[in-house]
């Protein structure tokens, strides 16, 4: 990881963006309403200047050692609210982490969900590290991608655990359009074969 303090100049831009694309979204009258977030927000939001990369080279959406009562925002120093990719990466992380938090407040049937892909989850990113070798931009780890799609998942993060898988479903519905999600589901109809494209 490249964890160091964020540049103060970017903190306000990040906060304004997450207010508009997270808080305002969930409190919109047609969704949760103005009281929806009461008692549901993370207790703390931590910001870091650099990326959150694990020992295998994969950039992560969250802090593996933290509780869901805390939200961790990375790459603040590179954030630019005019850059669609930077906003996309930030909001994928925010929506993923908040979905995990909501999963603890509104329990889902984990056993039933686990039965869908029980033997397909991976314990470590080591087996997919080859995909991220030389990756410098980060976005690749956060997108809908053929490799996980063909294994029955939306993203690389979905492969890591049932909780991440469930959170990814929510995060993706908030950051992608229906057409993109349908294309991923269509790719999932063709199982992955070693040696095929990523």
Describe the residue ranges of each PLM region.
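Auxiliary, metal-adjacent structural segments of Zn-dependent hydrolase domains
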Residues: 12-70
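Non-catalytic architectural context of zinc metalloproteases
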Residues: 1-13
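Catalytic Zn2+-binding segment of zinc metalloproteases
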Residues: 97-115
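Metalloprotease/metallohydrolase-associated module, dominated by Zn2+-dependent proteases
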Residues: 122-197
């Amino acid at each position: 990881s490249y964890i160091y303090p964020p540049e103060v100049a970017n903190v306000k831009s990040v906060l304004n963006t997450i207010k508009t694309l997270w808080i305002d979204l969930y409190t919109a009258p047609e969704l949760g309403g103005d009281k929806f977030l009461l008692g549901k927000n993370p207790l703390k939001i931590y910001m870091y200047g650099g990326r959150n990369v694990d020992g295998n080279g994969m950039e992560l959406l969250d802090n593996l050692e933290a509780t869901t009562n805390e939200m961790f925002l990375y790459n603040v120093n590179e954030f630019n609210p005019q850059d669609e990719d930077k906003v996309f990466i930030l909001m994928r992380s925010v929506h993923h982490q908040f979905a995990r938090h909501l999963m603890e407040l509104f329990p889902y049937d984990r056993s039933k969900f686990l039965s869908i892909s029980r033997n397909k989850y991976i314990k470590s990113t080591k087996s997919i590290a080859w995909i991220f070798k030389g990756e410098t931009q980060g976005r690749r780890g956060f997108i809908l991608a053929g490799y996980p799609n063909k294994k029955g998942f939306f993203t690389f993060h979905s492969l890591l655990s049932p909780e991440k898988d469930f959170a990814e479903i929510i995060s993706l519905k908030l950051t992608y359009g229906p057409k993109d999600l349908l294309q991923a589901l269509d790719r999932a109809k063709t199982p992955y074969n070693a040696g095929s494209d990523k």
